[in-house]
């Protein structure tokens, strides 16, 4: 059996949201003998679990990023010139089982309510073996996977349904490989569309017609919202493990191109925006900001500029931010900006000139000036910033700010951002400084969110090990951030019975007009999940969406807000 076939059998699905193994790894452990070798069936099962639950944070080659290095043995040079050694063999099977089962204070969730005792033991043995190196994936293989289900000539010339598309939500159904298109006005599911496994994000074309949905198995689906019943019109597999996608938004290039970035192989693919026909594959392997070669520099996040024909492509392990000029694909120009490791997610400031991204292993936020094509600032923050897209608002004292939460600390960090408005000149002294750290009710935050028409700031904490904290969201009045306006237990508001697994409240998302906030209640695969819709002014429940077809809803992407980068 060839390596590609072995890989595809073992890695048909990919990583979800497990997070950093932190303090538990710092504890000393006696060297342990290698675990018994796995059988072929055990290895295939373990490989599947690893890609579903672990690879997103620890890497395909297990070299670590947000999560720790999980190689059997590793060494590294310390600043004083000495050598430190570690690895999963040194930790030993018993210690590894405890970490996997119970999680850590550093942000890794417990898996004893997801995996059986035997599966936990299997994974402890699996990560003590040397990881396999998966195969590459070329332009030819990408093109061979490409399918146009509805040609452009056969698609509608105008919107054929009567839905308010601006307030439609594309909702990830993590464990079923689907997205639900939910009407934001009526709260009805208008369509459930088969996509790649564990969709990471949905992104909108500049026109608002197309939704680009990237699954963690590398499958990119293009959904046409103008059809009477919105459906997939084209798809392509861009790699074995992927996270990011965006489109061309600059004037004259609207909807012309799409770009998707992979975790494995480490590369990005440029495609036709209306058909997904692959045009170019570009590898991201190269040197880190420390001057060392890295074999697995994954594409973390991608955003599209409206001020230039450019994509901002963030390379996780190298700490390099790429400005990819798509005005001439054949003669591609790429500006490489050094920042810090390991780059993850981020978003635009209010002016859409500056892009801010978390370098979460360095506990920093990197800010890029896309007008000059240079790094604007590196800002030190608390442990493991995780902004999602972040949140923009006007602070009563410091003017325009951008907010990020943290996986590793119980704060929401506010950073002053520049503004060309004459009235904001008085805030220039604060630019690129942390001006306030708002006290959160716990670490483990993934997303913060607000809206231009709202007075509130919302934040979740789904990765916190405490049930009460993980099942709740916190709301602050942006005019007074000294204390929370309200802590909302989403699990209780859902009206669903308590389950053995923690039901994690995740990803607050505003309606197009800013009057509602939708929060996912993410339960186990066999448990009933829900989306709880809140009135943003009264903070009371307006609707609980609990359709049986809606299994493990996670990210929710409002069409208008996503189309216009409103957050």
Language-model segments: residues:
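Structural signature of eukaryotic scaffold interfaces centered on beta-propeller domains
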Residues: 146-163, 203-206, 245-254, 294-307, ...
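Loop/turn-rich, solvent-exposed surfaces of beta-rich toroidal or solenoidal domains
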Residues: 399-404, 410-413, 441-526
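Flexible coil segments in periplasmic/lumen-exposed cytochrome c-class electron-transfer proteins
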Residues: 30-36, 40, 51, 109-175
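Short loop/turn segments immediately following beta-strands, especially the blade-tip
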Residues: 223-228, 271-279, 325-329, 370-374, ...
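Axial heme c-ligation environment in periplasmic c-type cytochrome domains
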Residues: 64-74, 95-130
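Asp-box/WD-like beta-propeller blade repeats and closely related beta-sheet repeat scaffolds
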Residues: 233, 237-317, 330-338, 343
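Gly/Gly-Pro-rich "capping" loops immediately C-terminal to redox-active cysteine motifs
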Residues: 36-47, 59, 63-101, 190
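A short beta-strand motif characteristic of beta-propeller blades
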Residues: 188-193, 229-236, 277-292, 330-337, ...
